[in-house]
Amino acid sequence: MARQLFKRRKFCRFTAEGIKEVDYKAVDLLKDFIAENGKIIPARITGTKARYQRQLSTAIKRARFLALMPYTDQH
């Protein structure tokens, strides 16, 4: 009894929207790439290109450091 998962086509959101640089101040955009528990969702799940995944990771870490985003979920 193998569980079948819904497969959606993966595409890089940043390439599709024409975003050149990921900004740490765009908290609404960054929240889409963070799981409920506060972890960064990997590129193999989101479909983000490697270049943008690196920028995304750095931007999320900067936003966390500046207290724009939480490190973990709400306890």
UniProtKB/Swiss-Prot annotation:
UniProt-listed GO biological process terms: translation
InterPro entries reported for this sequence: Ribosomal_bS18 (IPR001648), Ribosomal_bS18_sf (IPR036870)
Pfam families reported for this sequence: Ribosomal_S18
Coiled coil stretches, renumbered: none
Keywords: Ribonucleoprotein, Ribosomal protein, RNA-binding, rRNA-binding
A GO cellular-component term linked to this record: cytosolic small ribosomal subunit
GO molecular function term, any single one: structural constituent of ribosome
Superkingdom to which the source organism belongs: Bacteria
Membership in a protein family: Belongs to the bacterial ribosomal protein bS18 family.
Function: Binds as a heterodimer with protein bS6 to the central domain of the 16S rRNA, where it helps stabilize the platform of the 30S subunit.
Subunit structure of this chain's protein: Part of the 30S ribosomal subunit. Forms a tight heterodimer with protein bS6.
NCBIfam families: S18
PANTHER family named in the record: 30S RIBOSOMAL PROTEIN S18 (PTHR13479), SMALL RIBOSOMAL SUBUNIT PROTEIN BS18M (PTHR13479:SF40)
Full protein name: Small ribosomal subunit protein bS18
